[in-house]
Amino acid sequence: MPTPSRAYTFARAQRDQLRQRYVTLRRCFRNDTRRPRLRALVDALLRGRAAVSMTLATCEMVLRSGRVLTAADVVASEVGSRSGPAFDHALELRLKKFYMARVHLESLLHFDGKAKYAALYVGGEGPDYGACCVLFERGGVRTDSTCFAGDTLTTVFDAEGNPAGLSSAEVLMRFATRQDVHRLGSLAYRDILDDGHPATPLDLQRLQDLLCVRDTLLEVHVHDDLLVEDIQRIIIARKVGRSMAQKLLRYDDASVAERQQMQFDDVRAYLAIHELADKRKIPVVGGTC
């Protein structure tokens, strides 16, 4: 059995505190008509999948390369090493103002620099800050993954990459193993449990909406390779599908020379995604094709 990541081992060591907070929450609903709502929330969170929001160009690159590359992976391939002054400098240039924030955060959470950042997906379009959402874990949930209540960078740091005021203890209260995502999520989304009449069912649409937004999503960290073979589905954002319809018409009508001169990079990536996904029998939903 593979050795668990340092981040997972670190998160697991703090599990007792999270479980105590979760037990306290459950006691609030012990003799309450809202208990089925809590059960539905737990079930939805446990069924969730890892979703990575990305540009069309990045999605095409993933399908061609066979795996998701982190910023550190890209930099390492450029400088020929994963450590040393040249690597650190190149990574700082790529991450810009968030470089020190990322270094601090990954040190605090015991990451090894190889973590892939995803979001928990329980339905809908998925995270709304990219052109497409790639769902992973076709073969099942990674056992040594970790999770975080919120987007680590935007929750712990401000828009300039400076600390947002959370103490290390407060940050760690948001961090857990993937197996505890239902406990962490139930505490993070307590408002959903308290909304409306106690006997009304869980508002699954509201949960999906919360999981789409950076400030309220549940971040998932995969401390291993994310491969094309793990892709379950690719979801093209609705906003991209609407704009792509007109671009495809212009692309079809353009000559070869015009296609080279005009800004059709996103169209080419869009078409390549469908072609590559079809070869690998990966469903692509949304868009216009």
Model-derived segments and their meaning:
Residues 106-128:
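Extended catalytic/binding region for NAD+/ADP-ribose chemistry, centered on the ART fold
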Residues 2-58, 72-109, 132, 137-289:
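Active-site-proximal loop/hinge segments that shape catalytic or ion-binding/gating pockets
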Residues 59-63:
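Short N-terminal binding/cap micro-motifs at the start of the first secondary-structure element
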